[in-house]
Amino acid sequence: MSEKFVKYPHHLKYESQDLKHVKLGFTTREGGYSLYPESSFNMARYVDDNPENITKHQEMLADAIGFVRAQWVFPIQTHENRVMEISQSHRGTNIDTLTDDMYGIDGIYTYEPDTLLTMCYADCVPVYFYSEKHHYVGLAHAGWRGTYGQIVSEMLKQIDFDYNDLKIVIGPSTSTTYEINDDIKAKFETLPINVKDYIETRGENRHGIDLKRANALLLNHYGVPFDNIYITDYATSEDLSLFFSYRVEKGQTGRMLAFIGQK
């Protein structure tokens, strides 16, 4: 399958023939005003960066994708599996300054137009949900904790239409070089999918995990057809000229922004 994330200045845009009203994408580290290193495009206010830089980057992205900043929504992620429906009243939350509003939310969805769902990433898996037919978009943040917590299942529980009408995009995130230990592997063995399909033992207390595939397997287990799931080849830990990587850069790095909305 050919790569559907197409590179533009400062972001990757997902392009598919079935998209008419939905826009989704993922920012890169290229260009911008942040120092991760110099001239990078950090999108997170919670890292050591000048807040004015993030505002400039937001404005640049807003101009590129056609959603003004006042239409954006940004929850405070905590690597859990809480999901929240977004209404028009939530627009603008945590865009200019971070607050306690929407704290501990790692999955969001809406049926509202002109509302941009956003979250920050630097290795964790962005899982995009959309249905043009039902005017629905959603976004989940799935690191190993969110994947183990089955946040994709929590997202699906909120959907009251046929999963055949649902499309999933699994975006840029860490590659299979990401490793977990025996204790974490044991947690994944309790999930309703076969660990042999996404975990590879590489040595004593070392197991490579494919978090993208794990989320795809979970989605399929709960009823989403594999034909409706797209997985990008882009890997944050493999291209530090294009992406930030929390693990590779040992936490001293910026964040990319995943976004999805409908007009």
Curated annotation (Swiss-Prot):
Name of protein: Purine nucleoside phosphorylase SH1728
InterPro entries per UniProt: Cu_polyphenol_OxRdtase, Cu_polyphenol_OxRdtase_sf, Cytotoxic_necrot_fac-like_cat
Function: Purine nucleoside enzyme that catalyzes the phosphorolysis of adenosine and inosine nucleosides, yielding D-ribose 1-phosphate and the respective free bases, adenine and hypoxanthine. Also catalyzes the phosphorolysis of S-methyl-5'-thioadenosine into adenine and S-methyl-5-thio-alpha-D-ribose 1-phosphate. Also has adenosine deaminase activity.
Residue pairs linked by disulfide bridges in the UniProt entry: none
Catalytic activity: adenosine + phosphate = alpha-D-ribose 1-phosphate + adenine; S-methyl-5'-thioadenosine + phosphate = 5-(methylsulfanyl)-alpha-D-ribose 1-phosphate + adenine; inosine + phosphate = alpha-D-ribose 1-phosphate + hypoxanthine; adenosine + H2O + H(+) = inosine + NH4(+)
Ligase in keyword set: no
Cited PANTHER family: PURINE NUCLEOSIDE PHOSPHORYLASE LACC1, UNCHARACTERIZED PROTEIN YFIH
Keywords: Copper, Hydrolase, Metal-binding, Oxidoreductase, Transferase, Zinc
The family this protein is said to belong to: Belongs to the purine nucleoside phosphorylase YfiH/LACC1 family.
EC number(s) on file: 2.4.2.1, 3.5.4.4, 2.4.2.28
Residues holding Zn(2+): 79, 124, 141
Alphabetical list of Pfam families matching this protein: Cu-oxidase_4 (PF02578)
Named cofactor requirement(s): Cu(2+); Zn(2+)
Oligomeric form and interacting partners: Homodimer.
GO MF entries: adenosine deaminase activity; copper ion binding; oxidoreductase activity; S-methyl-5-thioadenosine phosphorylase activity
Keyword hit for Transmembrane: no
Organism: Staphylococcus haemolyticus (strain JCSC1435)
